[in-house]
């Protein structure tokens, strides 16, 4: 009984530490200056980082192309000094910044899967508002946050809440019209 209580308390402590987020809040001036508008068509791209040796999912993030293009990199470690960040949302995601983001995650030991789906401007704006309002995400909670943002969005109703990057990628890949590379 004491061993189970000890195990429970240790697990609770670990979960408590992973819930600690590091909020960042760039100034409105910095966000406005960095704003990047790709233009239509509007789309959502899911990025899943996969360990090459184990095949396990290591990270999830979403690129949102709406009235502006941003990346929601929950609990991520990626950083660019010229791109302002607000609670895991990086602004100014032009093609060069996006290539840098993908290159940062894709290494000798990791692959990055890119899954894109075209959506209506209204759906893209809804996802943009959801990522902007989500808040800072604690370590190891990236897919939890990503799936929470997408769950219930029109066209994404089949997605379930999950902590597994590979499971989210599999479900996302089943959506009609998704292209994967």
Where are these regions (language model features)?
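C-terminal motif of bacterial Sec signal peptides marking the signal peptidase cleavage site
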Residues: 16-19
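Short, well-structured alpha-helical interface segments that form or flank functional binding sites
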Residues: 56, 122, 141
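Bacterial N-terminal signal peptides that target proteins for export
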Residues: 1-9
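Second-shell loop/turn segments in exported
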Residues: 48-51, 58-59, 109-117, 128-137, ...
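Glycine-rich catalytic cores of cysteine/serine-nucleophile enzymes that process amide/ester linkages
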Residues: 22-29, 37-110
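Acidic helix-start/capping segments at beta-turn-to-alpha-helix junctions
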Residues: 78, 110, 118, 122, ...
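Activation targets extended, charge/polar-rich intrinsically disordered C-terminal tails
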Residues: 21-28, 125-181
